[in-house]
A protein has these predicted regions:
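Divalent metal-coordination and catalytic microenvironments
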Residues: 50, 64, 74, 88, ...
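Metallo-beta-lactamase
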Residues: 46, 69-70, 75-79, 131-193, 197-198, 206-207, ...
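Accessory terminal helices/loops
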Residues: 34, 124, 131, 251-259, ...
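Bacterial N-terminal signal peptides that target proteins for export
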Residues: 1-16, 25-29
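Conserved beta-strand hairpin/beta-sheet module of binuclear metal-dependent hydrolase folds
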Residues: 42-90, 201-214
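Solvent-exposed loop/turn segments at secondary-structure junctions
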Residues: 58-61, 70, 77-80, 103-109, ...
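Active-site metal-binding motif and surrounding structural segment of the metallo-beta-lactamase
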Residues: 44, 67-71, 78-131, 142-144
Length: 339
């Protein structure tokens, strides 16, 4: 005897087929399909209706446009500031209103001063208007405001490289999550202590569903662990886990383009699957080195044992600013510093 299919099941199957038919088998998202534009060495990629990524200025820059104006995440290297400003002006004729820095590295904060001066503050007056000097500082003397984790301000103000007009005008401390509402979008900033460095911030545009990861994520090579500035391998893995927790995959319609997009500090745009693969790679290598340390192996012995085996071709160049050897050394020193 064969079971019959009732009308309820037929309706359910019909709804499922209709839903599948509504989505093509190939990506049609006009933004992802749009060809990047390049001018003055800056590549402009539209990733959402109101979100763009600028590449080629040192680190990736994100431009979020809305009724308030343009909100930037990072500003690139100082020497590329004029080209970056021109690229932003091709995207929008609104003023730069706010800048958020993901870290303190020169390729992310170098353009702060020029781009802030090209903008205009969101605040006509500061909350503590009774204190004239404090009021001017919070409104950045009419220029766009700059927000970052306090260690970014500490680094920039301790260096002769950066003019005071490029320092963060608001540095958040204490709580690891800071929230703002900009351009009709909820913006969350998560401080990730001791990851790439001790000054890393993840920026999440909730409505746009875009995350800016800064130097926590760089799919071109193994993560850079900046030991001198508070970076650790365990903090890096914790930060990658945070990224995974914040992202949403395209399930159940896995062939469609709808998903959380993650913009790294350098290189191509990623999604949750990319971050998971990257996190797993970093974790495997960390665990291999930790096991070798427990067995009493020296750094040179660990290098000869090749703990990055299976990943070097994709992530571990032998030459350049960040190599396989440098990564293994950083992981070893990070792990042995705890003991």
């Amino acid at each position: 005897m064969h079971a019959s299919v009732g009308p309820g099941w037929l309706r359910a199957i019909g709804c499922l087929l209709a839903a599948v038919a509504a989505y093509p088998l190939y990506p049609t998202d006009r933004l992802r399909a749009q060809q990047p534009q390049q001018s003055g060495g800056i590549e402009t990629i539209q990733v959402r209706p109101n979100v763009w990524m600028l590449a080629g200025a040192g680190g990736n820059i994100v431009v979020h446009v809305g009724w308030m104006g343009a909100v930037l995440v990072d500003t690139g290297a100082a020497e590329m500031s004029d080209q970056v400003l021109s690229a932003i002006q091709r995207i929008t004729d609104t003023r730069i209103r706010f800048i958020i820095n993901t870290g303190a590295d020169p390729e992310h904060v170098g353009g702060n001063a020029v781009l802030a001066r090209a903008g205009r503050t969101l605040l006509r007056y500061a909350p503590n208007a009774g204190n004239f000097a404090g009021s001017d500082f919070q409104t950045n003397f009419g220029a766009a405001g700059i927000m970052a984790q306090e260690n970014v301000l500490t680094r920039m103000s301790a260096s002769d490289t950066y003019p005071a007009t490029g320092w963060p005008t608001e540095a958040f401390t204490g709580a690891r999550v800071r929230s703002l509402y900009l351009n009709g979008d909820g913006v969350q900033m998560f401080h990730q202590p001791a990851a790439h460095s001790d000054a890393d911030t993840i920026v999440f545009f909730r409505r746009a569903d875009v995350i800016v990861a800064g130097d926590i994520l760089d799919l071109r090579h193994f993560p850079i662990i900046d030991l001198e500035n508070g970076g650790t391998i365990d903090g890096e893995i914790a930060a990658l886990n945070r990224l995974i927790d914040l992202t949403v995959p395209p399930a159940p319609l896995v062939w469609h383009e709808d998903r959380t997009l993650v913009i790294p500090g350098h290189g191509r745009i990623a999604d949750q699957a990319d971050v998971v693969e990257y996190r797993d790679m970093v974790t495997v290598i960390r665990d291999r080195i930790a096991d070798m340390i427990k067995r009493g192996m020296s750094l040179e012995q660990i290098k000869r044992a090749d703990p990055a085996k299976g990943y070097r071709r994709q992530y571990g160049p032998e030459t350049g600013p960040w190599t396989n050897d440098m990564f293994v050394t950083a992981v070893y020193r990070s792990l042995t510093a705890k003991s």
